[in-house]
């Protein structure tokens, strides 16, 4: 699709002051931001944390993670999708496909191309098909609306229960259709209704069987036929007639034929029953509701519940406003609030699903979720603990009611610790919360024998615990040994934080000591770029001898390697709870700064061509904090320089506007923090100070609290901090604490300039796991 044509759809006609809560901030949201070039964002229609994400499914021969691709053929329009994920697709179920003319075989290839660029705006999606059909979409929390305009002639809608997003990567992660049923009824007022269910398994998280129920209506009279395929995957039809129902492990569905060129369908979903699916659509999209009214409902929900949480009167730069509000939008597409729709257990606790993934989101996304959505955040914490109660482990990732996978540590521990140290109490049972964390820290999860890594569990928990507990390091008998070790250390620091808060001194001492065990992977003899000492692998031989390692290479960087998806030099900066020790091991502050500077030097990496071959990778979460670590060495100006350069170079309000996979909003959350001028250290109350993008920002913290940030002398070439006042008091530290500006609200008043200034002469940021920190 032509990028400029796609982008222009969301450009606002004008820019007004954003100081009013009544301002339609949705005008600045580009649902298409990040939906191309590997960002994998979902450009369809959804509510914040909504179950339904109604959008197109396209086939290109490669994986369509959100259903959408900018090229290829439409194969359906489905109610369930993810956003910003990778690995393999999930969902793409409860689908309809409009077809003109006569449908002789509904299981044949019905795919069709675009006739023009899709139209997107918050709350609305439109596709123009090359066969003359126009598809317009709207959504509520548990239901969706399809509005079709057909050319003259017979008009059909095909409902294929077996429809699901496929995977083409050859890793055994493709979703499978396991069977389903469909029944067609005519209501008392003459409206056509269909309902049924489909069951599926596998997908990105290797899930067992799960079932979704559906209930759909059409606003026009229709003739119908149900169909039955020969098997679960083929195109051979063995039944295609006016039977009112089909139920089989083979492909089933129905074709509805209309005499009208305008047809509207309302479809609800549930994970409990078809009856509940009907109740959901009847409640949320009642008969007679118009698409434009539904669009306004969606816009209002996003405006009032999400976008208005950050406001500004600095409206001179539309690009910055689009980046701000598009990032807020995509950052909160998932997780999904499935409270009331959990088929596995009954509980008074909330239930959240579609957690992609804590190893990506714990650094910057979940801390931002806490600030902007405190009620949702508390519910989310309660849901994680409840999953542990009923399933034995908290998830590091979860979808379709099933934990899986875990790439590194048990990073739900970090999320819980972050909530605890920042005062989340409410209805959270913290004794159970700590017990869930203890399970991660002490119980070896059963090996799920993942062919990508058969050495230990990739489903949940910490599969390499035997080494970690016995040796204080992880040997190469376990895959991803080094990247696991640095994350396990952070996880144990999380336990220390909660244990300390619960006055469990024995546990606190134990896990603080264990959190320092990342040091056992610091190989003082590894050298690169004239620096010595990096995180390295250790063999399973007695004594854990060092294994030779190039600090600038992670080999395959995949499930079976010592480092997952990041270089040794990147992971060597990731002891964020113990940075003072890291600075010392690196040779002191000057050497530490020199190491950081090397990360941003073009041409030092054989990879990362899109980033100038730098070792720093803005599209990869282990690099997220790296630009801000200068604050620990007295060079806050370089934190501003490097983080601002990355943000402005690699983010844009366009389909290719992300530096990599969105990772369920992790990328967008990194940008949002940079725009605010802070960076969180998860599991601590510390926020590193950078430089804000707007002359003023007001962050609504809930409960009448707000953080107000101002920036005097801000310009495109004037963004270095000259001075800072916090709550009206001159400030000389390159960090603030939760209690300073978030717990009760506060103010941060920056004075900026075009050149660095030595303003941050006070205490360095805390390093709580360091003996001298």
What are the residue ranges of the model-derived segments?
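Short coil-to-beta strand junction motifs in C2/discoidin
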Residues: 691-694, 716-721
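Short aromatic-glycine motifs in intrinsically disordered, low-complexity regions
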Residues: 707-715
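Accessory carbohydrate-recognition regions in carbohydrate-active enzymes
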Residues: 18-366, 370-378, 382-414, 420-486, ...
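Fungal secretory targeting signals
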Residues: 1-22
């Amino acid at each position: 699709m032509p990028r400029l044509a796609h982008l222009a759809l969301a450009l606002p006609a004008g820019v007004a002051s954003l100081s009013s809560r009544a301002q339609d901030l949705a005008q600045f949201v580009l649902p298409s931001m990040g939906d191309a070039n590997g960002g994998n964002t979902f450009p369809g229609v959804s509510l914040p944390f909504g179950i339904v994400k109604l959008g197109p499914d396209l086939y290109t021969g490669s994986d369509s993670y959100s259903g959408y691709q900018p090229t290829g053929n439409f194969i359906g329009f489905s109610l369930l999708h993810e956003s910003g994920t990778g690995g393999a697709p999930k969902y793409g179920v409860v689908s309809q496909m409009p077809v003109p003319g006569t449908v002789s075989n509904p299981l044949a290839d019905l795919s069709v191309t675009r006739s023009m660029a899709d139209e997107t705006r918050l709350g609305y999606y439109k596709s123009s098909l090359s066969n003359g059909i126009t598809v317009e979409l709207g959504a509520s929390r548990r239901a969706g609306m399809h509005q079709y305009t057909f050319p003259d002639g017979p008009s059909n809608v095909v409902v294929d229960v077996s429809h699901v997003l496929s995977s083409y990567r050859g890793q055994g992660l493709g979703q499978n259709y396991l069977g389903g049923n469909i029944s067609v009824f005519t209501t008392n007022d003459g409206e056509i209704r269909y309902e049924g269910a489909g069951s599926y398994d596998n997908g990105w998280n290797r899930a067992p069987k799960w079932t979704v129920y559906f209930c759909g209506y059409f606003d026009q009279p229709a003739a119908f036929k149900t169909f039955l395929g020969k098997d679960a995957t083929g195109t051979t039809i063995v039944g295609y007639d006016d039977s009112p129902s089909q139920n089989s492990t083979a492909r089933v569905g129905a074709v509805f034929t209309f005499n009208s060129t305008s047809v509207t369908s309302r479809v609800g979903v549930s994970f409990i029953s078809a009856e509940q699916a009907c109740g959901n659509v009847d409640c949320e999209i009642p008969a007679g509701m118009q698409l434009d009214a539904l669009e306004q409902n969606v816009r209002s929900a996003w405006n009032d519940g999400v976008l208005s949480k950050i406001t500004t009167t600095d409206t001179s730069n539309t690009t910055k406003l689009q980046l701000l509000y598009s990032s807020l939008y995509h950052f909160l597409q998932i997780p999904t609030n499935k409270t009331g729709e959990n088929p596995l257990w009954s509980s008074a606790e909330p239930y959240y699903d579609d957690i992609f993934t804590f190893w990506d989101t714990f650094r910057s996304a979940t801390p931002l979720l806490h600030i902007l959505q405190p009620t949702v955040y508390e519910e989310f914490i309660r849901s994680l603990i409840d999953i542990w109660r009923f399933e034995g482990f908290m998830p590091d990732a979860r979808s379709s009611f099933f934990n899986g996978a875990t790439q590194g540590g048990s990073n739900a521990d970090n999320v819980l610790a972050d909530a605890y140290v920042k005062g989340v109490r409410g209805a959270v049972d913290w004794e159970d919360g700590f017990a869930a964390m203890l399970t991660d820290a002490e119980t070896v999860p059963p090996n799920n024998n993942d062919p990508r890594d058969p050495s230990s569990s990739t489903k949940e928990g910490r599969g390499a615990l035997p080494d970690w507990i016995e040796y204080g390091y992880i040997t190469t008998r376990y895959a991803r040994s080094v990247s696991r070790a640095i994350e396990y250390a952070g996880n144990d620091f999380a336990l220390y934080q909660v244990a300390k808060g619960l006055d469990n001194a024995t546990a606190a001492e134990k896990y603080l000591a264990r959190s320092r065990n990342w040091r056992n992977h610091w190989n003082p003899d590894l050298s690169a770029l004239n620096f010595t000492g990096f995180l390295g692998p250790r063999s399973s031989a007695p004594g854990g001898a060092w294994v030779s390692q190039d600090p600038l290479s992670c080999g395959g960087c995949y499930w079976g390697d010592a480092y997952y998806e990041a270089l040794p030099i990147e992971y060597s900066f990731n002891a964020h709870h113990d940075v003072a020790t890291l600075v010392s091991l690196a040779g002191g502050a000057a050497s530490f700064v020199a190491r950081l500077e090397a990360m941003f030097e073009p041409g030092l990496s054989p990879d990362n061509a899109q980033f100038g071959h730098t070792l720093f990778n803005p599209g990869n979460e282990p690099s997220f904090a790296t630009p801000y670590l200068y604050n620990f060495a007295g060079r806050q100006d370089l934190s501003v320089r490097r983080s601002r350069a990355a943000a402005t170079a690699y983010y844009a309000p366009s389909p290719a506007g992300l530096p990599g996979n969105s990772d369920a909003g992790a990328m967008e959350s990194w940008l949002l923090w940079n725009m605010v001028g802070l960076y969180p250290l998860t599991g601590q109350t510390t926020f590193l100070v950078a430089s804000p993008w707007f002359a003023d920002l007001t962050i609504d913290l809930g409960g009448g609290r707000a953080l107000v940030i101002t920036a005097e002398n801000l310009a495109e070439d004037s963004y270095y901090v000259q001075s800072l006042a916090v709550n009206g008091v001159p400030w000389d530290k390159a960090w603030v604490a939760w209690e300073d500006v978030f717990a009760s609200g506060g103010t941060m008043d920056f004075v900026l300039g075009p050149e660095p200034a030595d303003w941050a002469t006070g205490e360095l940021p805390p390093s709580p796991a360091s003996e001298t920190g």
